[in-house]
Amino acid sequence: MKILFDLLPVILFFVAYKIAGGNQAFAHELASRWLGDGIAVTQAPILLATAVAILATIAQIGWVWMRHRKVDTMLWISLAIIAVFGGATLFFHNPTFIKWKPTALYWLFGGTLTVSAVIFRRNLIRKMLEAQIRLPEPVWKRLNLAWAGFFILMGFLNLYVAYNFSEEAWVNFKLFGGMGLMLLFVLGQGFYLSRHIQEETT
């Protein structure tokens, strides 16, 4: 359930885009009414989907705050990035900004892991996981490096899809491609870590 909740803005973005794409005349009328004139019919689906994603992220944070009176830093970061890039897309009626949003998030994560390890000598992956698993120090370093590299590569991959494929293909990749690659990476990490956990506990 938590995974679905975390993915809610992405899922609603996808659903809104598909619904608006199947009803372009109505979507164009709605987008023009809410976001101003000068919007092309083909732009309406991505603009409405962006607005839905922003509202979903705000609602997500509101729900978490009402239940726990505390919001994770990651949610605030997600809100800031969707507000900046999504807001720019809505203001300028230009989908380029929202297409850069996943890359900005990936590179922020990858950069944070790298800078923390290289400059501050802090392994953030270890800090997050050491309460659950015990690993040799070299494995922690490789794990941190692997995640940093994964996020940086995902940022480049997002841009490649955004600039070399159709808008609809990018929207599909945003949900299914990104999440699918993340799942495969996590499974691969699990197999790799299981060997070292077994070695340490035997």
UniProtKB/Swiss-Prot annotation:
The chain crosses the membrane at residues 3-23, 46-66, 73-93, 100-120, 145-165, 173-193. One of its GO terms (cellular component) is plasma membrane. Its main location: membrane. The keyword Nucleotide-binding does not apply. Keywords: Cell inner membrane, Cell membrane, Membrane, Transmembrane, Transmembrane helix. It is found in: Cell inner membrane. Plays a role in cell envelope biogenesis, maintenance of cell envelope integrity and membrane homeostasis. Belongs to the YciB family. This is Inner membrane-spanning protein YciB.
